[in-house]
Amino acid sequence: MKKVLIMSSVHPWNDTRVFHKEAVSLARLGYDVTLYAVASNHVYEGNIPNLRVVTFAPKSIAQRWKTWLQLYKIAKRSNAEIIHIHDPELLPLAYLLKRKHRKKVIFDMHEDFPAVLKGKKIGKMRMPKWLLRVVATTEKKMLQKMNAVIYAEKYYKENYESLTTKQMDIYNYPFLQEPTDILKYEKQTLIYAGAIHEIRGFKEMLAVAKLLKKANNDFQLLIIGKVPQRLEIYAEQFIQKHDLEDEVKLLGRLDLHELMTYYAKSHIGLAILHPEANYLRSLPTKIFEYMSVSLPYVLSNFESYGRLVEETKSGYVVDPLSPNEIASQIQVLLDNPSTQAELGANGYKQHVANFNWSVEERKLGELYDGI
């Protein structure tokens, strides 16, 4: 049985892609898998054959180097046939493992790294172009040494056309879901799950809740994910000021199985991301999760999102920076349960036909078999 070592210094051990999809799939395909990742508010019960999980406490950015060193020492001593690395900050580690220790290494790209860098700041200044070029050149040289590079989005590889190493697209599609008969919440329920940040529409969602309450709607907004302290304070003040205690619920981070139940019981999914470079062409996983439980949704009006909505007829797009427009489109859905049902059914058909993990699992197995 081939041994696989999976490592992340950023993601919690029960991350949907890292654990539930890739690690579990590899164990099911017959690999002996060990995952090193960040501890979360859930504990692995050790109930999956061939899969071991080792966690470490999350560290601040300033202290993250200690985790990198720890993972490097573990990996270089490991007898795993394949090492699967998940974070850009661990790419130098992956490069050293390949060049210095002759390990077989896969790098898994979750985001459009060049676009992310363009949005970063040093103090109050954007990263200078010369530094972006240096980082991009260095990144490509390191990626070229990998045994394989995995892309979570099809367009990512447009930045790496010069690479000749093995490459494969493995998308974040949800597990194939059976039609659900779970009862919906009595209140019309809006739901968002994922990273919580200003640029992911957190403040706009609260503003929308205020507008919907002002229009006398009986609803609730569930926001699932770890809320940074600054936004937790903002939310508490906003909720109290506008008397939204009965409407807005911040539920913290949930495990995937719990999350899917919340989705299934809700009425409308939200993905109101701001027009940041890393988001414009990258379809959020949550859209496909919404489809898998027949949940209609409201998305940002980016070109790639608009194409998906046009092709699938399963949701609506709006200006993500306009709470009034977002609230108006949600109001249309709240007032028309039959439209909710029609859009949800369209999305589920697409989930079964095109957007589920089964195909991606086969691709992952083929990639591993070829290394």
Task: Report each predicted region and the residues it spans.
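Conserved donor-binding/catalytic core segment of Leloir-type glycosyltransferases
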Residues: 5, 150, 182-209, 222, ...
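N-terminal strand-loop element at the rim of the active site
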Residues: 6-20, 24-64, 73-78, 155-161, ...
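Membrane-proximal helix-turn-helix segments that form the acceptor-binding/catalytic region
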Residues: 24, 69-76, 96-100, 113-116, ...
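Donor nucleotide-sugar binding/catalytic pocket of nucleotide-sugar-dependent glycosyltransferases
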Residues: 52-54, 129, 135-179
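Nucleotide-activated donor-binding/catalytic signature segment of Leloir-type glycosyltransferases, i.e.
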Residues: 225, 233-260
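Acidic donor-binding loop of glycosyltransferase active sites
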Residues: 263-280, 295
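Conserved acidic donor-binding segment of nucleotide-sugar-dependent glycosyltransferases
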Residues: 311-312, 316-323, 332-338
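A short, well-ordered alpha-helix in the C-terminal region of glycosyltransferases
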Residues: 325, 332, 339-354, 363-366
